[in-house]
Amino acid sequence: MAEPTSDFETPIGWHASPELTPTLGPLSDTAPPRDSWMFWAMLPPPPPPLTSSLPAAGSKPSSESQPPMEAQSLPGAPPPFDAQILPGAQPPFDAQSPLDSQPQPSGQPWNFHASTSWYWRQSSDRFPRHQKSFNPAVKNSYYPRKYDAKFTDFSLPPSRKQKKKKRKEPVFHFFCDTCDRGFKNQEKYDKHMSEHTKCPELDCSFTAHEKIVQFHWRNMHAPGMKKIKLDTPEEIARWREERRKNYPTLANIERKKKLKLEKEKRGAVLTTTQYGKMKGMSRHSQMAKIRSPGKNHKWKNDNSRQRAVTGSGSHLCDLKLEGPPEANADPLGVLINSDSESDKEEKPQHSVIPKEVTPALCSLMSSYGSLSGSESEPEETPIKTEADVLAENQVLDSSAPKSPSQDVKATVRNFSEAKSENRKKSFEKTNPKRKKDYHNYQTLFEPRTHHPYLLEMLLAPDIRHERNVILQCVRYIIKKDFFGLDTNSAKSKDV
């Protein structure tokens, strides 16, 4: 008994194609043999029977019941497909057009077209094979014509492909300009306005929501946020008057000069040290001297000589070469030149002081010159006078003979010049290609200034006031001849 089959089943002797892959049936007995297997395989398959039901059990196969087809043989080429296609027969896969490549039921004509045109991707071989799952290039065997794989990105979900619709902006009829909010109806607007509060400051009339008022107070009334207010004519006139007082006119310049002279007479000659980023760009700063080597060439040579002398192991390292000690030195110069930047980490073992200054006053100044912010006790540096052989009576003598400091200065100069020449020659020998860089090499080794501590920057006004008080005390001691050394009282009064 014949079993019911679907429309796509074939008669006995044909293998079903699960993926609609054409198969080759047995050749007819009358077909002439080919020279090679390829030409034999390229022959079109025989057409399927018109009826969908299977033949009876004792019947012969369809290939034997039908009359044999005469295949047209051409030497060296397969027969054309159109010559053996019968009505209702399915052409081979290679001969199908992309539009008519769908599987057709047995009862439908071949001129049927679907609403969406589909086509099957063909492999690179001559015969189409089953698609392999491990090949990502042929993972999807077919696509709609208008959604081709070359132009469509299937990695994105379909929701993202669609364009997002623009949301309609809400329409507000009531606005609060202070809070920058809008409301749709009068009730919400009235509720919001009832939540407005006033700024807690007395002179401020700002009203807004509580959170907005908090931001307003932080930005306008917080400590350190006070700004110039020129709302009334009186405030504008007061501000203009202050500007006129500080404007650098000739009268204001003369007035400032007089104030400066009065401070110098009192002994308050120090000013508050300025700290900031632009301090390194000043005229006498360390960075300015490095960037402009030509302007301070003499100063660099003097420092190089001093370093050469202090670096040597000779007996001249006990002297501080800051210049020849003057016979009539002003003790104010010791504290004027000693600001926060003059404190070095490495203190000299010995120092030369002027003859007029007494040991008690020198110890006071040396202990004061130490770092005030340090926790440890200030260490007193040992003081060595210029000439121990000369006694105190030579200080009182105005017509004293020439001090041996001049001979020491000449010896130091000759020694430093010889040292610098030897240093230059050794540098040229070791680096013959960098003779031109000797000047730059010499300017790099300059004394580093002391980096100010945070405590020094915070207490800069107090430090300036304290040092000015000490300078006034020193001035008073010299004028009144407190120690009984009537050296040059007349000259000190003129100062």
UniProtKB/Swiss-Prot annotation:
Keyword Ion transport: no
Tissue: Expressed in spleen, thymus, prostate, testis, ovary, small intestine, colon, peripheral blood leukocyte, heart, brain, placenta, lung, liver, skeletal muscle, kidney, and pancreas.
Residue ranges that the Swiss-Prot or TrEMBL entry lists as coiled coil: none
Polar residues biased stretches: 98-108
C2H2-type zinc finger segments: 174-196
Intervals of motif Bipartite nuclear localization signal: 243-260
Key words of the record: Metal-binding, Nucleus, Phosphoprotein, RNA-binding, Zinc, Zinc-finger
Subcellular location: Nucleus
Cellular component, GO, one term: nucleus
InterPro entries, per database record: NUFIP1-like, NUFIP1_cons_dom, Znf_C2H2_type
Subunit details: Interacts with FMR1. Interacts with ZNHIT3. Interacts with NOP2, NOP56 and RUVBL1.
Protein name per the record: FMR1-interacting protein NUFIP1
Biased composition (Basic and acidic residues): 416-431
